[in-house]
Amino acid sequence: MTGDNTVSALEAEFVYWEKTKDLVDQLIDLILNYRQSGHPGGSRSKVHALLVTLLSGVMRWDIRRPEKRFGDRLVLVAGHTIPLVYCTLAVLNEALRVKYQQTGDERYRLPGPERTLYWEDLLGFRRLGGLPGHAEMAGKTLLLKFNTGPTGHGAPAAAGEALALKRAGAGGVKVFAFEGEAGLTAGAAHEVMNSAWGLALDNLFYVVDWNDFGI
């Protein structure tokens, strides 16, 4: 990726993003079918938005070191759509793993298995000792910056992080919050919108996936 994230500069990447989207979509279907549990609708309908956010350069993050202090933050407000994040990380990490094996270039070297989510980890989705069914900021998913689950749960946290960053003089750090339209029914969502406007949280980006699935 270059520093230019205009549409014209990124257009050549779109074909690869589309292939990545297809891989993530198929993985979501596979792990939910394998486990016979989970939330497919909201997980699949957010794939495009998440990939564009992660790959376009609009969000500053490092897949190898997501805990970097001044990296942008991701809050999955709709925590039940966590298969989206698991499968996205699995695809991107596998690409880096293959690239490192081919080149030996340290830029593609990932941390150990305790910090990296691989294809095989997906088999443990919603199983004891495996990947949990809702978003958790831990271990292999330090990309996430809050533990979420119920509708609207992560909205106040996202706004709080954005406010704290501004008050700490780090207003250049952006907070990206992903939610579905059903999550807007919670009172907390409306309170967050009003608060974000009143507090001028221009570092909070609230991405609403209007999928009409509801769950």
Feature locations, PLM:
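N-terminal glycine-rich anion-binding loops that anchor highly charged ligand groups
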Residues: 22-23, 41, 45
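Non-catalytic, mobile gating and regulatory segments of ester bond hydrolases
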Residues: 1-18
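Long, well-ordered, tryptophan-enriched scaffold segments
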Residues: 210-215
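N-terminal capping segment at the start of a domain
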Residues: 21-37, 209
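Residue-level marker for buried hydrophobic side chains located in beta-strands
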Residues: 177-178, 206-209
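A structural signal for short, well-ordered beta-strand segments and their strand-loop junctions
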Residues: 40-41, 75, 207
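Cofactor-binding active-site loop characterized by glycine-rich and histidine/acidic residues
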Residues: 17, 28, 34, 44-199
